């Protein structure tokens, strides 16, 4: 009878260990994915998005100024001032994006270390709560949903693009991330 109990206990322990590792693996996938996506969105999408906005702004301001150059120089001066202020705002936004990405990267890296150190499900859930708090309000969904950034992140990290991990703020984001990341959507 004791051998049966011992065997059942061993099986339960083995199942608990497997569940722990599976949950740890899922959570690490989420963190690794977001580290890669955060970095590539910053590098590829964020930069070219700012360049495109700036180009449109300059062209629009020039066209606007040209319309009124004959009527009044005041309009041209206003257009130039507005263009300069807007360009400064674009630069500020880009720098702010870089800073936020760096902070998130550091926090996600610490989360990976914490995941490796967790010894049981309860400790993993504590780490999960911290992961859920990392930049959920700061995540720019236009970056997250950008197919180029997602595909680059998936490829560079060698991650399985079909996995869905629904934890915290990523529960609502995976609906956007995963479909765009699947191979059949790649150009």
Feature locations, PLM:
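Conserved non-transmembrane functional hotspots
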Residues: 2-58, 71-74, 88-187
């Amino acid at each position: 009878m004791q051998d049966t109990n011992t065997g059942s206990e061993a099986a339960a322990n083995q199942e608990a260990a497997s569940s722990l590792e599976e949950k740890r693996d899922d959570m690490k996938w989420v963190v690794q994915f977001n580290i890669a996506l955060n970095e590539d969105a910053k590098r590829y999408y964020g930069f070219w998005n700012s360049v495109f906005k700036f180009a449109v702004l300059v062209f629009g301001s020039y066209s606007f100024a040209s319309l009124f150059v004959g009527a009044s120089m005041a309009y041209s001066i206003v257009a130039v001032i507005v263009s300069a202020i807007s360009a400064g705002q674009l630069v500020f936004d880009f720098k702010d994006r870089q800073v936020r990405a760096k902070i998130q990267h550091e926090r996600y890296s610490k989360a990976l270390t914490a995941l490796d150190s967790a010894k049981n499900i309860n400790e993993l859930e504590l780490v999960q709560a911290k992961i859920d708090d990392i930049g959920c309000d700061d995540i720019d969904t236009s970056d997250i949903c950008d197919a180029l950034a997602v595909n680059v992140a998936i490829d560079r990290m060698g991650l399985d693009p079909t996995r869905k991990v629904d934890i915290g703020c990523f529960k609502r984001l995976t609906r956007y991330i995963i479909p765009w990341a699947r191979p059949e959507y790649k150009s």
